[in-house]
Regions:
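Switch/communication elements of ASCE P-loop NTPase nucleotide-binding domains
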Residues: 1-5, 192, 197-320, 338-339, ...
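Flexible phosphate/Mg2+-sensing switch loops adjacent to catalytic phosphate-binding sites
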Residues: 5-26, 295, 354-355
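Glycine-rich phosphate-binding loops of NTPases
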Residues: 10-22, 37-143, 403-437
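Conserved catalytic network of the ASCE P-loop NTPase/AAA+ motor domain
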Residues: 20-25, 54-58, 69-71, 99-103, ...
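Short glycine-/polar-rich loops that comprise or flank the Walker A/P-loop
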Residues: 25-29, 58-63, 103-107, 283-286, ...
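Hydrophobic positions in the central parallel beta-sheet of the AAA+
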Residues: 108, 239-241, 330
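Extended helical coiled-coil dimerization/tether regions that scaffold
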Residues: 125-237, 392-396
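Acidic, Mg2+-coordinating catalytic modules of nucleic-acid enzymes
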Residues: 319-329, 338-517
Length: 517
């Protein structure tokens, strides 16, 4: 906002604007803008305004904000410069508190608690324009009506009585042959001073006040949209939106997300949010994670939905948008793991979600997409994956898919990848036990936890007799793997607190301790 927003910049900078009040260190911000596309209208606007500061071969514009604290004046005055060569920038010309940049960029700052009525009244002259010929006649009628209204008000008995009382009181101080007259001055210039937006239901002539805060918020965005259109031809609109989720329920936040990230009007958009729902439709965005502790630097990562994930975009974004607000993320195979682990953590670590722990099922997406973003944002993540085998076509052998997956996640070939001859529970256990030393090393150094077999078989190893009792089935594994979702729900409803602690403390499910402790 200091770089682009004239309303903020004209306030200058105080000592509190300097990090930790280090007043001996000047503030310097450099914004780089790519203008390589000469056919783009926004690039053309910049090139036209920069003139001599930009040569034809320059493909980037550098905008520099510099402010040095003056201890005598007790403030810092901003200096803005720009150009196509970072080492030879020209200082911007200034007219009053406006810089050259203010004639190109139009900053639309939308506060999280913006007042609808104040916004409407402030901009009503821009929003409501009477430019048609027939409006002239209507305005004349309104003026005549206002004159009649003023005359009627002045003729009220209460007004006359007040005049009769006030005149002699005034004449006590100065008798100069005058009288006091009370007149109404309702004028056409205040034509819009009392108009208010109302919600009107289709097929219903009744008007409803826009009392709901969510409704007001949506009307506010609608007004800002109209105002931005007024400047779109002449200026580049920058939308700066603070916490748009306030007063909007989940479905409206998701609807707003679709508008913000798909409407070309919001090409240049900066959003601060605490809500994952606002990010559901994100694509081609730079995610910046701001920490609550005293870290100087935030963490950022560019995120684009890969082409092969476009069909699963909503699923990918939904889980990712929630994960990036967490401090720790446990990535699991699917809904069965999610349900079981949520149950266990809710018992052992009751407020795990409030403590920033999130369980993310990667079903249909895979681990890698999530891991890459979480790692870039420095969000601690734990992986729990199955010891899968896959038949090699025409060979009668099986590739060790689970081992290959682990090698991929840790970035080195620590586990053997030779094909094996058998696909069975015992073969998977034997493969695991033969490599347990390296698997434990991968656990401790990379937080990647491979199942001995899979969720159901590993759980059966932990509490076989207890599963027999709870499920009343001779083969708990087969039962849980048949109608997996339904039967897992049945199981977790029957698990006791003791059962949950048994699972939590067992080697097979050490991933839970890893993420919780």
């Amino acid at each position: 906002r200091y770089v682009f927003d004239k309303d903020i910049r004209k306030q200058n900078l105080l000592d509190s604007d300097f990090h930790n009040k280090q007043l001996d260190k000047p503030i310097e911000i450099i914004v780089t803008i790519d203008i390589i596309n000469v056919a783009d209208s926004d690039c053309q606007k910049l090139r036209a305004q920069l003139k001599g500061a930009l040569l034809s071969e320059h493909n980037k514009v550098y905008i520099k904000f510099f402010a040095e604290y003056n201890k005598t004046e007790m403030l810092a005055l901003p200096i803005l410069s720009w150009g196509g060569d970072i080492n030879h920038l020209q200082e911007m010309k200034q007219r009053g508190y406006l810089y050259e940049i203010d004639y190109i960029f139009n900053v639309i700052y939308i506060d999280s608690y913006v007042n609808l009525y104040s916004l409407f009244k402030k901009n009503v002259s821009q929003l409501v324009k009477n430019e048609k010929d027939e409006d002239k006649g209507i305005l004349t009628k309104i003026q005549n009506t206002v004159d009649d209204l003023n005359d009627h008000i002045a003729s009220l008995s209460g007004i006359k009585e007040f005049e009769n009382k006030l005149t002699p009181e005034y004449q006590k101080f100065r008798d100069e042959g005058i009288s006091v007259s009370i007149k109404s001055e309702i004028a056409v210039k205040g034509l819009y001073s009392n108009i208010i937006p109302y919600i009107k239901q289709d097929n219903d002539d009744n008007l409803y006040p826009t009392a709901g805060e969510g409704r007001k918020k949506l009307l506010t965005y609608s007004i800002y949209d109209i105002l931005s259109d007024e400047n779109a031809e002449k200026k580049i609109n920058l939308f700066l939106i603070e916490e748009p989720e306030n007063h909007l329920h989940k479905s409206m936040q998701i609807a707003l997300s679709q508008i913000l990230f798909t409407d070309t009007k919001y090409t240049y958009l900066f959003v601060t949010t605490h809500s994952p729902f606002v990010l559901y439709e994100m694509d081609n965005v730079n995610l910046v994670r701001i920490y609550s502790d005293r870290k100087i630097n935030g963490i950022s990562a560019f995120y684009k939905v890969p082409e092969n994930y476009e069909k699963a975009r909503k699923m990918l974004n939904r889980c990712l948008s929630e994960a990036i607000f967490a401090n720790k993320v446990l990535l699991v195979e699917g809904p069965s793991e999610y349900m079981l682990f949520s149950k266990v953590l809710a018992i052992v670590h009751q407020f795990y979600e409030a403590d920033g722990i999130y369980i993310l099922p990667v079903d249909g997406i895979g681990f890698q997409m999530y891991i890459s973003i979480l790692d870039k944002l420095e969000i601690f993540n734990v992986i729990k994956t199955d010891n899968d085998l896959r038949a090699v076509k025409g060979k009668g052998t099986y590739s060790v898919l689970g081992f290959s997956r682990c090698n991929k996640y840790i970035g080195k070939e620590l586990l053997p990848t030779e094909q094996i001859q058998e696909n069975s529970i015992s073969a998977k256990r034997a493969l695991y036990n033969a490599n347990i030393k390296n698997l434990d090393k991968i656990r401790s150094e990379h937080s990647v936890f491979l199942s001995k077999v899979d969720l159901e078989n590993d759980l059966d190893e932990v509490m076989h007799d207890r599963l027999l009792t709870l499920l009343g089935e001779t083969s708990p594994v087969d039962y849980l793997q048949d109608s997996k979702h339904y039967h897992m729900v049945e199981l977790i409803e029957k698990l006791s607190d003791t059962d949950c602690r048994t699972i939590y403390n067992h080697y097979n499910f050490a991933c839970l301790k890893e993420v919780a402790e």
